[in-house]
Amino acid sequence: MRPAHAVIDLDALRHNYRFARRLGGGKALAVVKADAYGHGAVRCAQALEAEVDGFAVACIEEALELRQAGIQAPILLLEGFFEAEELELIAKHNLWTVIASSWQVRALAAFHSPSPIGVWLKLDSGMHRLGLEPKEFRDAWMSLHRLPQVGEIVLMTHLARADELDNPRTNEQASVFAQASQGMVAPASVCNSSGLLGWAGLYSDWGRPGLMLYGVNPIPQESTSLSGPLRPVMMVYSRLIAVHELPAGEPVGYGACFVTERPTRVGVVAMGYADGYPYFAVNGTPLLVDGRVCPLIGRVSMDMLTVDLTDHPQADVGSQVQLWGVQPGVAELAAHCNLSAYQLLCGLKRVRRYYLGEMGAV
């Protein structure tokens, strides 16, 4: 069996959720969209359900996957509904929905729900993606308040630059949100992972931790000391499947983008860009071979990559290779490849997942 696999530490996931909730000081929605950022949404939700305040997903398909797996906790649709017909499923499966536009308010007003639907009313405070404009926000809130088919309303917005601690945009967005929601008696949700980790002065009744749940700080590490308590959740491993001894002056891999400058031991690892390892990883990107840092050499191919073992003579066929996890961390590897940690985690494919404390793989 091909040795490439990921180990998901569910204890670390629970630890990170508790830390996020403590930081926020209120409740916290565990964001498990995009298959829990590549970690497996169902298994992650099952691990958190006993203590979670709720989950957040992108769309109704992701929510239904959790419901079909037996998850009973509240689930919020972060993108809301795309068609009015989806309200039937939202009501049937007891989902919460974001309302981010006036047509959604009208659709909900025309829908006769058998039970009240929880609504998160979203303000566009300056990200200019989803959300009602400030001038529409109060009228939408008042309209929803009058509807018997609407349950609790949470007021929310999304921060665009909270990962930049010296940028004034976060405070500007918070001010827009405070002004637009002034006098509205309702819980508020402002902070995503960056907001929770970097902006202690911003209070949310509901936090929305996403990337930090999986042990990754979205803020550059030198900018905050709060990443320390986070524990990595995903460790990606493979093994050496071949070792070659090359003289100086030999090209390695497609395009000869690496040429040996000395006699070199080259290890071949069963992991490539089809598995989710970054195609654009540069020479020198660190990997851990039997616990020792070794540099990537040559271009990453579809199914394999190559590593310099010259200074690690004990490494041989069968040696374990950690692609990311504790060392290198997800953020470190992403920086080497000019990617975001989000891309790296969500792009993991064709790799078996094992869950610590559980049997079997997905």
Swiss-Prot record:
The entry's family comment says:
Belongs to the alanine racemase family.
**Which top-level group of life is the source organism from?**
Bacteria
Its UniProt pathway annotation is: Amino-acid biosynthesis; D-alanine biosynthesis; D-alanine from L-alanine: step 1/1
Instruction: Give the residue spans that cross the bilayer.
Output: none
One cellular component GO annotation, for this chain's record? cytosol
**Catalytic center at which residues?**
K33, Y254
Give UniProt keywords alphabetically: Isomerase, Pyridoxal phosphate
Q: Which residues carry this modification: N6-(pyridoxal phosphate)lysine?
A: K33
Name of the featured protein: Alanine racemase
Q: What does this protein do?
A: Catalyzes the interconversion of L-alanine and D-alanine. May also act on other amino acids.
Q: Which reaction does it catalyse?
A: L-alanine = D-alanine
Q: What class of enzyme is it?
A: isomerase
- The species this protein was found in: Xylella fastidiosa (strain 9a5c)
State its Enzyme Commission number(s): 5.1.1.1
Q: Extract the Pfam families matched here.
A: Ala_racemase_C, Ala_racemase_N
A Gene Ontology BP annotation from the UniProt entry: D-alanine biosynthetic process
